[in-house]
């Protein structure tokens, strides 16, 4: 981070080789983890796979959490027009002999990017009712997926 502290998750963990969705009733869920939120295209791919809600269990450091956590999750919600349910560890724990402190602040964001539930510092939880009508309205009123696909952008 900008304060000189660092943590490189990729030194300990490898990437998966496929995107995952599952069904609960009539709702398609997209599954990601912590570092995945830095890849907007992954969230768009989950949307194309039918995701309406994307889960993001995470373990963000204090610095990256403070600077990136909420803004990135809200951005992924807006871009994908999916609900984002981000559960985050909080506090300190031992990892390979060193104490690591993590940010917490679990949250739920709607497809418009509004944070509709948020945990504060400390232990706690955030809950929200996922409303499919909100998803349908946002996607109807601003059909970004169809517009994006129609443009066939290549950089």
Regions found by a protein language model. Give the residues of each.
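Residues within well-formed alpha-helices
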Residues: 75-76, 105
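Conserved acidic residues
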Residues: 52
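C-terminal beta-strand edge segments of enzyme domains
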Residues: 89-155
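Active-site catalytic loop in hydrolytic enzyme cores
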Residues: 1-49, 62-71, 75, 141-144
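Short secondary-structure boundary segments
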Residues: 58-59, 87-90
């Amino acid at each position: 981070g900008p304060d000189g502290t660092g943590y490189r998750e990729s030194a300990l963990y490898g990437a998966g080789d496929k995107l995952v969705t599952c069904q609960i009733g009539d709702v398609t869920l997209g599954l990601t983890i912590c570092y995945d939120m830095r890849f907007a295209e992954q969230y768009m791919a989950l949307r194309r796979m039918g995701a309406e809600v994307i889960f993001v269990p995470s373990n963000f450091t204090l610095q990256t959490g403070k600077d990136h956590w909420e803004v990135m999750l809200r951005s992924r919600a807006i871009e994908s027009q999916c609900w984002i349910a981000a559960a985050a560890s909080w506090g300190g724990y031992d990892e390979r002999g060193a104490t690591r402190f993590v940010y917490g602040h679990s949250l739920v964001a709607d497809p418009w990017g509004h944070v509709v539930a948020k945990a504060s510092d400390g232990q706690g939880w955030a809950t929200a009712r996922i409303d499919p009508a909100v998803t349908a309205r946002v996607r109807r009123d601003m059909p970004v997926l169809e517009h994006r696909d129609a443009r066939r952008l290549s950089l």
